[in-house]
Regions:
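Glycine-rich phosphate/pyrophosphate-binding loop and the adjoining helix
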Residues: 1-2, 7, 136-182
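N-terminal beta-loop-helix "entrance" segment that forms/cooperates
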Residues: 41-57, 150-151
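Helix-loop-strand module that forms the ligand-binding subsite of alpha/beta enzymes
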Residues: 56-132
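A generic structural motif
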Residues: 30-37, 135
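N-terminal beta1-alpha1 ligand-phosphate binding loop
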Residues: 2-33
């Protein structure tokens, strides 16, 4: 079997991002048969339909999404919703012909944030994913606090319980991709 290629997309751009820490941990602990890459969003501009020639960072993002069998969306919570960098990445991808980059693609969501561990933002993101026709895996969910010591000063995930949840989610995503393929 070819390995499942998963693309991580992180809604936070800061160097010590805890959401990026979640994705890094996932990449380092991907199960056998799964490879995780992480998209570079730092240079991706806001979606603008006037940009007929797509900027290089957008082209790279779209190519990464195209080759991915599944998406792993790391979703910070900004003002009760998903962060703009993540929404912007999905907006760019959604404008390709017939939404072919996203429609039917399996995906899972994880997040690190304030009091509710990004629950509000994640459920908002799920609503967005309905329109995009991404096939989200429901459980296990990964909610975590960015402020309770679960992450070190560089944003690395150090909480063993959350680490276990991420590993469990990756296994579930792998099964989900296999089910959708069969
Ligand atoms: C503009 C802004 C709005 C935020 N609003 C919320 C919020 O509504 N709920 C919440 O739990 N955290 C909120 N936070 C805190 C973020 O969830 C927190 O900074 C999180 O760690 C960001 O992820 P990062 O570590 O990956 O950068 C907000 C942060 C910013 C910058």
């Amino acid at each position: 079997m070819k390995p499942i290629k998963v693309l991580g997309i992180c809604g936070s751009l800061r160097a010590a991002s805890t959401n990026m820490g979640l994705l890094r941990f996932a990449r380092e602990h991907a199960p056998a048969g799964m490879e995780i890459n992480i998209a570079a969003l730092g240079e991706v501009p806001f979606y603008n339909a006037d940009l007929k020639q797509k900027p290089a960072a957008v082209q790279a993002l779209l190519a990464d999404i195209k080759q991915a069998d599944a998406l792993l969306l790391a979703c910070p919570e900004y003002n009760y919703s998903l962060a703009p960098a993540l929404k912007n990445a999905l907006d760019w991808a959604s404008r390709e012909t017939d939404n072919y980059l996203l429609a039917g693609k399996p995906a899972a969501i994880m997040g690190a944030g304030g009091g509710m561990g990004t629950a509000r933002a994640q459920y908002h993101l799920r609503q967005v994913c309905v329109f995009l026709n991404l096939h989200l895996y429901n459980k296990p969910e990964v909610f975590s606090s960015a402020f309770d010591g679960s992450y070190d000063e560089k944003g690395n995930l150090i909480n063993e319980k959350i680490q276990g949840m991420v590993i469990e989610q990756l296994g579930a995503l792998q099964n989900w991709v296999a089910r959708l393929r069969s």
